[in-house]
Amino acid sequence: IKMQLSKNLALAEVTRSETAKRKGISNMPTPEHLENFKKLAENVFQPIREHFGVPIHISSGYRSAALNKAIGGAGKTVNGVYIPSSQHCTGEAIDIDMDGTSITNRQIFDFIKDNLTWDQLIFEFGTEENPDWVHVSYESTGKQRKQILKAVKKGGATSYVPYK
């Protein structure tokens, strides 16, 4: 399906997944999730794209429940039914990774933090100066938590601590 979510963001960019392709997993959003992605594109992605004036690389966008489970994304199994808790599964989150470009992940993180409306912003691993990637979400109902976290490894497991 050829569709633009915003001027510079195509649906294909947020649904692309090597894991889904390899495992034959469908990764098409529902109409509701598509509407959520349009809000994220308008309020977060497009302002980033226009500010920096270069293509913005999305390393992870939409994830169907099956894809989220396959990659070990946030979720749990209740009575044998997998329930994803990641905002990637509702069309409300993207991960941005600008490695190999003239823009750093830190520049993206700081621009979002200081200039945009967002729900959750995560400085994903990396060094004190630069995250490995940036996770950002936009709550489709408009109720933004403005939660800033840092992902860290503790004893081999990922945990999220308040960003300072």
For the regions a language model picked out, list residue spans one by one:
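Catalytic cores and adjacent binding grooves of peptidoglycan-active enzymes
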Residues: 84-85, 90, 98-164
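Active-site-adjacent substructure of cysteine-protease-like catalytic cores
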Residues: 63-90, 110
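Short connector loops at helix/strand junctions that flank enzyme active sites
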Residues: 51-53, 89-93
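Extended, low-complexity, intrinsically disordered C-terminal regulatory tails
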Residues: 42-76
